[in-house]
Amino acid sequence: MTQFEPVIGLEIHLQLNTNSKLFCSCPSGMADNPIPNSAVCPVCTAQPGTLPVLNKGAVELAVKAALALNLEINKISLFDRKNYFYPDLPKGYQITQLFKPISEHGWLEVNGRKVGITRAHMEEDAGKSIHHASYSLIDWNRAGTPLLEIVSEPEIHSADEAYEFLTKLKSNVSWVGASNADMEKGELRVDVNISLRPAGIKTFGTKVEIKNLNSFKAVRDAINVEIERQTEMLNEGKKIKQETLLFDKEKGETVSMRSKEDALDYRYFPDPDLPPLVLADEWLESVIASRPEMPARRKERFTKDYGLSDYDAGVLTSERALSEYYEDTVKTGANPKNAANWITTDLLGAINAAKLDINDCPVTAKQLGTIVTLTDSGKISRAQAKKVFEQCWQTKKDPEVIVKELGLEQVSDENQLETWAKEAIAENPKIVSDVKSGNPKAIGALIGSVMKKSKGKANPGKMNEIFAKLLQ
């Protein structure tokens, strides 16, 4: 049986995070507005005599996204018309960038190697068709929303690599604020182009396109299903037909939608209503200079400067706001490793349970830093610290105030601790005998006795040291 290599390319449509549409002042991001056709105007509904005016903010976000994907910025780019008729496309054409896009020749690191990005170009979104049994309705709220279409090179060779590519792309573009990239809201849409070729052969096989992918998991599942389908067909001597497929996640299969259109069908030509987009050197330099430290670099710094594990650094740099929260916590003087442990377990656990975003977290970085420091200094135990965290979450009070109000501060005075230790030794001769007979774990019972005497306020770490000294 012949071994085949998958050859995969991705086309990603990214909704840019602007307040208004690409060529008019109508509000953007209104696709889910319950009132259809309420965010439209003569421009985005293509009324006669209207002209497009390019949104400068969309250009800036497109450049920021492109830089985050290591793309080269073209200082001069052009807009073109992609001609096709569809009811939710009011003009009868889509304004896009075919001949001279705003950016080209980028890459993302996947599985230890660079996967190329052919281009990223600006274009406007179409509207939305709502189909009923005997009629269809059109909602143009989404028409004209600014998109950045990102096209990868056919250099992805597995479903897992495609998943990693998309995960890094989403992380990078959301990191720079270009897009929220939320697939559930339609802010990031993915089409997959895939073909198979015999291992070791460089020529491409017949490709198919897969649509209707609403999550990264769906992308991974669809690729695996299609690889299996094509492998079976090729081994049976059948030919792959060039077509567009839909992925049915319920049945776990790809279904034919239509034969694949040739790009020439769209009759592209330059848009006569839009002049060339020229990016001034000074403006472009200011955008480049405003770039934040990117996730990969920040992750590397966290492992090097703070001694974090690769896993913890990865979690903390999964979102820009989360990484900044962590650094703000460390700036309070909190131990970096212990702060990371608190954030990756207690804090994120509470945030996820409450279905909140890190920006909405009721416990500030300063407050968490105080909790970490109180614990590390021995003033409160880890168990008590959790109580303080919960109270801080609910009341937003200062942790030190909560410690005083609840009477949680541990006793660390050695004279008092030694007095309790001697009392526990006198009251528990059997346990003392066990310790002296070579069972050091029995000290735990003595510490438990002291914790009862102190109503849980004795510092257990110091008690362990004192018992070890007294029972030598």
Curated annotation (Swiss-Prot):
Heterotrimer of A, B and C subunits. Pfam families: GatB_N, GatB_Yqey. This is Aspartyl/glutamyl-tRNA(Asn/Gln) amidotransferase subunit B. Coiled coil: none annotated. Keywords: ATP-binding, Ligase, Nucleotide-binding, Protein biosynthesis. SMART domains: GatB_Yqey. It catalyses: L-glutamyl-tRNA(Gln) + L-glutamine + ATP + H2O = L-glutaminyl-tRNA(Gln) + L-glutamate + ADP + phosphate + H(+); L-aspartyl-tRNA(Asn) + L-glutamine + ATP + H2O = L-asparaginyl-tRNA(Asn) + L-glutamate + ADP + phosphate + 2 H(+). Allows the formation of correctly charged Asn-tRNA(Asn) or Gln-tRNA(Gln) through the transamidation of misacylated Asp-tRNA(Asn) or Glu-tRNA(Gln) in organisms which lack either or both of asparaginyl-tRNA or glutaminyl-tRNA synthetases. The reaction takes place in the presence of glutamine and ATP through an activated phospho-Asp-tRNA(Asn) or phospho-Glu-tRNA(Gln). GO terms for biological process: translation. InterPro entries: Asn/Gln-tRNA_amidoTrfase_suB/E (IPR017959), Asn/Gln-tRNA_Trfase_suB/E_cat (IPR006075), Asn/Gln_amidotransferase (IPR018027), Asn/Gln_tRNA_amidoTrase-B-like (IPR003789), GatB (IPR004413), GatB_C_1 (IPR042114), GatB_Yqey_C_2 (IPR023168), Gln_synth/guanido_kin_cat_dom (IPR014746). The keyword Nucleotide-binding applies. The keyword Protein biosynthesis applies. The gene is gatB. GO terms for molecular function: asparaginyl-tRNA synthase (glutamine-hydrolyzing) activity; ATP binding; glutaminyl-tRNA synthase (glutamine-hydrolyzing) activity. Belongs to the GatB/GatE family. GatB subfamily. Its EC number is 6.3.5.-. The lineage of its organism: Bacteria, Pseudomonadati, Elusimicrobiota, Elusimicrobia, Elusimicrobiales. NCBIfam families: gatB, PRK05477.1-2, PRK05477.1-4. It comes from Elusimicrobium minutum (strain Pei191).
